[in-house]
């Protein structure tokens, strides 16, 4: 927080405080100045804000380009799939979910990524990029755009914290945290709004009546303009006038369709939501909430009121959402910036003494800080690169196979009927929305289908109670489902892939709804592998690819590796040869490791230790022995008994030959 003018005049050697936002300048210009707080060292760069923004953009770009995992289906099916439809047309294979068919979503969000797709496709055509490079550009484009939005959200979160705690306080630097997962755009837009709404509340509190009227008028004009633009855009997207927020409330509250996707306990957000959202910051957030609501913050009145507003919203929003039976952590994700601001002050108070002094009293706090940092880094790395990575990698494999066997070498396909061209077929026997769709498949000639999970729209209460979607029917009895819902059942499975079949005998697969055609590639989780081996024994399907997906999963149907079976015997043999070669390499590395252990144990150590000490009254056998054989000690030719193992000297673990075979 800024120091008072009197204290600055009494010490002329203090540097002037750096400039901040216009709202902060207005508050500092008032005669009421905040009390001194812990100050950061003066910055040598006068334009700190621009440097911070550039750093956040760079960090977010690296974050976006290194993400290799799957977070939530909505980051693809509620944004990128509708955007693909806007940019390339319906016949290019986007999966449009039921929410869009019933006008439950606004098209403003997908419109951003539709523009990105259009620009990326134009760049690819202008530069003459290969299909592989074009696909990578189309996949990376939305992530780069979202990274910039997230960076701006982080920047304005920092600006709000700087306004509350002061330009040079530690708290303003403790609020921006790493978020490894993909973020919905409306969450970041709310981060931007947090600053505007909070500063507007301060202006409303301090201003005269005329200025309040001006602020209210501008808020009304801006809100009405956004609502009008959203309504017009939805009119062009859906083809008729509609109001998605009202229909969203009707379907999810009046018809209770949200409960179809799961019911949660009333305390979900308190017992699971906040812990999953905040992880290691949870204790500091709880302290910040308690202090803010229990005792008045030691800040200026206006700044303290902002913290009270943030704390109230952070409690009121989960309480309101708890009324709805279906709950998810991402519903309270927009609260994360506010929660970080509230946790900043307790975090600084706890760790700053341990970092600014060398007192041994704070060793435990230093160790705690190191643990929290490493815990966050470990979580970020695992969730960004490993957990649920197989469902992304498998689509890269499918695209590679399409490059080999499909028609990706065609420079451009007409949007009217891409299905008339050849390609490869893929079926996903997974819970619905387990993988991204056309945003990662890219090529329209990759003909794919997957199990659906449409809710019971328009059914009676009795019909809703007995309703089972397609994915549920499959997992209830996989063998019977394949018999009843696949073309030809289990007795007429193709022997050859479609790309090796003459065009006259090819049949175009039906997307998304049964009956499904038997595809060239079957994709499923390893949990289902024993069932499919039994159901498809004797068929031409065999394993041709496998990759790690997750070490654990809360959904038992999604556990294990992602496995791909295919009809191409050459690919099956190549994969088996590759697996055998990998096993040989692993065995050779293990054997080399054992040999090195033998050589190291057989070579006498040059370092002196107690085991090499020999009493003048004893003699060791000089004959050669195996490295793992226990050495004997004798006295005048008689073997001495082993010394007892005293507990206070510590029990030394003896190495055996068996231990050499383990890493």
Curated annotation (Swiss-Prot):
Keywords: Endoplasmic reticulum, Glycosyltransferase, GPI-anchor biosynthesis, Membrane, Transferase, Transmembrane, Transmembrane helix. The chain crosses the membrane at residues 47-67, 110-130, 137-157, 226-246, 269-289, 304-324, 335-355, 367-387. It is found in: Endoplasmic reticulum membrane. One of its GO terms (biological process) is GPI anchor biosynthetic process. GO terms for cellular component: endoplasmic reticulum membrane. Residues 1-44, 492-512 are annotated as: Disordered. It is a multi-pass membrane protein. Residues 501-511 have a biased composition (Polar residues). Its main location: endoplasmic reticulum. GO terms for molecular function: alpha-1,2-mannosyltransferase activity. This is GPI mannosyltransferase 3. It comes from Emericella nidulans (strain FGSC A4 / ATCC 38163 / CBS 112.46 / NRRL 194 / M139).
């Amino acid at each position: 927080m800024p120091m008072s003018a009197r204290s600055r005049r009494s010490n002329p050697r203090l540097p002037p405080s750096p400039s901040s936002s216009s709202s902060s300048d207005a508050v500092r210009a008032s005669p009421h100045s905040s009390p001194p707080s812990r100050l950061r060292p003066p910055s040598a760069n006068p334009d700190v804000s621009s440097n911070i923004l550039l750093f956040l953009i760079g960090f977010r770009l690296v974050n976006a380009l290194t993400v290799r995992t799957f977070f939530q289906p909505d980051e693809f099916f509620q944004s990128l799939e509708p955007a693909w439809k806007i940019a390339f047309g319906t016949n290019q294979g986007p999966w449009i979910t039921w929410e869009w068919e019933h006008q439950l979503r606004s098209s403003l969000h997908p419109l951003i990524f539709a523009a990105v797709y259009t620009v990326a496709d134009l760049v690819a055509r202008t530069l003459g990029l290969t299909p592989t490079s074009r696909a990578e550009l189309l996949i990376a484009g939305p992530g780069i755009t979202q990274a910039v939005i997230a960076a701006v959200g982080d920047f304005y979160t920092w600006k709000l914290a700087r306004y509350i705690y002061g330009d040079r306080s530690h708290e303003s630097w403790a609020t921006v945290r790493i978020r490894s997962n993909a973020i919905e755009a409306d969450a970041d837009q709310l981060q931007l709004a947090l600053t505007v709404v909070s500063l507007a509340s301060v202006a409303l509190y301090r201003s005269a009546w005329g200025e309040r009227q001006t602020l209210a008028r501008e808020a009304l004009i801006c809100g009405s303009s956004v609502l009008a633009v959203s309504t017009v855009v939805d009119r062009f997207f859906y083809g008729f006038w509609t109001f998605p927020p009202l229909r969203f409330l009707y379907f999810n509250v009046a018809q209770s369709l949200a409960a179809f996707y799961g019911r949660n306990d009333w305390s979900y957000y308190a017992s699971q939501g906040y812990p999953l959202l905040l992880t290691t910051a949870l204790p500091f957030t709880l302290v910040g909430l308690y202090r803010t609501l229990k005792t008045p913050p030691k800040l200026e009145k206006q700044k303290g009121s902002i913290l009270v507003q943030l704390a109230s919203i952070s409690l009121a929003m989960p309480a309101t959402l708890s009324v709805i039976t279906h709950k998810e952590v991402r519903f309270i994700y927009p609260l994360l910036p506010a929660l970080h601001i509230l946790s900043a002050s307790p975090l600084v108070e706890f760790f700053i003494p341990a970092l600014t002094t060398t007192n041994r009293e704070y060793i435990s706090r230093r160790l705690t800080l190191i643990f929290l940092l490493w815990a966050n880094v470990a979580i970020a790395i695992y969730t960004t690169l490993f957990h649920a990575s197989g469902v992304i990698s498998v689509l890269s494999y499918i695209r590679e196979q399409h490059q080999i066997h499909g028609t990706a070498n065609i420079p451009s396909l007409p949007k009217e009927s891409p299905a008339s061209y050849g390609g490869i077929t893929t079926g996903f026997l997974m819970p619905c929305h387990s993988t991204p769709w056309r945003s990662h498949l890219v090529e329209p000639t990759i003909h794919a289908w997957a199990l659906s999970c449409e809710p019971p729209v328009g059914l009676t209460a009795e019909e809703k109670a007995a309703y089972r979607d397609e994915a549920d029917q499959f997992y209830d009895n996989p063998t019977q489902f394949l018999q009843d819902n696949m073309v030809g059942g289990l007795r007429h499975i193709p022997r050859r892939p479609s790309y090796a079949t003459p065009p006259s005998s090819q049949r175009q697969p039906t997307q998304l709804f049964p009956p499904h055609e038997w595809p060239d590639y079957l994709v499923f989780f390893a949990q289902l592998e024993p069932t499919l081996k039994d159901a498809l024994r004797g068929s031409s399907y065999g394993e041709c690819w496998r990759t790690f997906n997750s070490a654990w999963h809360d959904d038992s149907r999604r556990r294990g590796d992602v496995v791909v079976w295919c009809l191409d015997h050459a690919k099956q043999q190549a994969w088996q040869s590759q697996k055998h070669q990998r096993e040989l390499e692993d065995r050779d590395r293990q054997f080399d490791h054992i040999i090195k252990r033998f050589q190291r144990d057989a070579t006498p150590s040059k370092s002196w230790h107690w085991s090499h000490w020999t009493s003048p009254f004893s003699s060791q056998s000089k004959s050669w022995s195996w490295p793992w054989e226990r050495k004997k000690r004798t006295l005048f030719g008689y073997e001495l008994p082993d010394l007892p193992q005293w507990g206070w000297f510590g029990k030394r673990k003896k190495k055996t030959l068996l231990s050499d075979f383990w890493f």
